[in-house]
Regions:
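Long, contiguous alpha-helical "rod/stalk" segments
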Residues: 80-93, 97-99, 192, 196, ...
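Short proline/glycine-enriched turn/loop segments at secondary-structure junctions
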Residues: 329-333, 444, 467
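Periplasmic alpha-helical coiled-coil/stalk elements that build and connect Gram-negative outer-membrane
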Residues: 21, 146, 162-277, 389, ...
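Small/polar-residue-enriched beta-strand and adjacent coil segments characteristic
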Residues: 25-27, 56, 62-68, 80-83, ...
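Terminal intrinsically disordered/low-complexity segments used for targeting and assembly
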Residues: 2-71, 130, 154, 238-283, ...
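C-terminal structured "cap/appendage" subdomains that terminate the fold
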Residues: 414-450
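A short glycine-centered flexible hinge/capping loop motif at secondary-structure junctions
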Residues: 210-214, 418-422, 459-463
Length: 497
């Protein structure tokens, strides 16, 4: 390359970096945010050091088995797929960044030729011409199209990272909900086993009373009906439990055959969960962050569409050596260079394609803004839903405990009356059914409260916050100088082999 061309190349690079980028610069859109949650009265305001807001949020339930299962979520195949999609998005950022740089090609060649007869200035006979050339092609980013593409791809990569975290939180919460529901079924099974034992005892007593002529045969049949019905309910729980166990296995990346969970008592109570301010929710939920980053990407697409209206400039340059003697090919005397062609192009008629693409970009931006605001509203709804659920379920649980106590008392009184012969066995059956139903409801309420607690943590982001989003450098994969080579350094050995 001629020394006189070097200042020109430097100037072109500098002009590219300082040139304007057409299209609107990104401004985060306004979102509907309330000053406080409707259901927040009586709740503790979240603080940065609250355990419930940490990444290991499930530990607030103090269940070692749940902790063990949650630690295996990284093996979930959907999560692995999402992580790969994030790396794909990083690759798109890298590809866009590379478009800012010129492309260099190294060419080596030789040609055999024979001069025409009668050319006295050319040595006659067959000769070989050797050549070695480095060619450069470059399209300067005069209008910021490439830089806007980098912005768009960076926004999409950051959105992909946030989507990955949203999926992780969803899998974690689904696992916790399935686990607690399984424990509810175990508690229901324990309750039914106790009921079956009680009904069996009642049936035996009724048979003895029938044998001595105190009660009718119908009492024995009715007592046996109650017993068999309770047994059938207990067996039916096995179907639901098996499905939940299989679902848990898949959530942690295992086949159903690889996981068996022993039955355990339902002793976990819904913990107190600090609630953050509505304005903080925008920074804590990865799905909202993903929607906002998609808005940024859509905004950059407007600039890309607008840059298409402006002319493009393509530059080419070559530098190399030519000689008929390979021995002196790389000497100064055999060196040559060429600048050009330099070509500028401007589309003057395209049938409205660019206008359509620009309008499409504007519409895409508007759609992404609406999607972002909808994500915010949905986030607020989910927090309110689960705050209300926890409040109402707590009230219901208190009343239900009283109902269980009353039903148990009624059953005891009815049994005494039946043994005294003052009521029929139908009264006993009614009291038994009421007692069992109320106890089952109490167990289910405990599970519902645990589920609502899990979903509230999920609704508040599970300890995630915007600072965990990848930076622009991280969205590009923290590129090293070796990443700009044709072959990554760590794969050259593989290619050689």
């Amino acid at each position: 390359m001629s020394f006189r061309l070097k200042p020109l190349i430097v100037a072109l690079f500098a002009s590219q970096l300082s040139a304007c980028a057409v299209g609107p610069d990104y401004i985060r859109p306004q979102a509907p945010v309330a000053t406080e949650f409707k259901e927040v009265k009586g709740w503790k305001t979240a603080q940065p050091r609250d355990t419930a807001l940490s990444g290991q949020w499930w530990e607030i339930f103090n269940d070692p088995k749940l902790n063990e299962l949650e630690s295996q979520v990284a093996s979930n195949q959907s999560l692995i797929q999402a992580e790969a999609q994030y790396r794909q998005a990083q690759g798109l950022v890298q590809s866009a960044q590379s478009s800012l740089l010129p492309v260099f090609n190294l060419n080596g060649n030789f040609n055999n030729f024979k001069s025409a007869q009668g050319q006295t200035q050319v040595i006659s006979g067959v000769r070989t011409l050797f050549g070695n050339t480095v060619a450069m092609a470059w399209e300067p980013d005069l209008w910021g199209k490439v830089r806007r593409q980098i912005e768009a791809n960076t926004g999409n990569a950051q959105a992909s990272a946030a989507t990955l975290q949203a999926l992780r939180l969803s899998i974690q919460s689904n696992l916790a909900v399935a686990y607690f529901q399984l424990k509810v079924l175990d508690a229901q099974r324990t309750l039914l086993d106790e009921t079956v034992a009680a009904y069996q005892k009642t049936l035996d007593i009724t048979k003895n009373r029938y044998a001595v002529g105190v009660v009718a045969k119908t009492d024995v049949v009715q007592a046996d009906t109650q017993l068999q019905s309770a047994k059938a309910q207990a067996i039916n729980l096995g179907v639901q439990r098996a499905k939940l166990e299989h679902a848990i296995a898949v959530l942690i990346g295992k086949s159903p055959a690889e996981l068996s969970l022993a039955a355990s008592a339902l002793t976990t109570q819904a913990p107190a969960i600090p609630v953050s301010l509505p304005s903080e929710l925008l920074e804590r939920r990865p799905d909202i962050a993903a929607a906002e980053r998609k808005v940024a990407a859509a905004n950059a697409q407007i600039g890309i569409a607008k840059a298409a209206y402006f002319p493009t400039l393509n530059l080419a340059m070559s530098n190399g050596f030519q000689s008929t003697d390979v021995g002196d090919l790389f000497t100064v005397a055999r060196r040559y260079w060429a600048f050009g062609p330099a070509a500028a192009a401007l589309t003057v008629f395209d049938g409205g394609v660019k206008n359509a693409q620009y309008n499409q970009a504007i519409a895409g931006f508007d759609a992404s803004v609406a999607a972002y605001r909808q994500a915010v509203l949905t986030g607020f709804q989910e927090v309110e839903d689960n705050l209300a659920a926890l409040r109402i379920l707590e009230e219901q649980a208190k009343v239900q405990d009283q109902a269980v106590a009353s039903a148990n008392q009624a059953l005891a009184l009815t049994n005494n009356q039946y043994q005294a012969g003052t009521v029929s066995y139908l009264n006993v059956m009614t009291a038994q059914t009421a007692a069992l139903s109320n106890r089952q409801t109490a167990v289910q309420l405990q599970g519902d409260r645990l589920n609502a607690a899990v979903l509230l943590v999920k609704a508040m982001g599970g300890g995630w916050n915007e600072t965990l989003l990848p930076t622009e450098e991280q969205a590009a994969g923290d590129r090293k100088w070796t990443d700009y080579l044709i072959l990554p350094v760590d794969t050259i050995g593989e290619w050689v082999e």
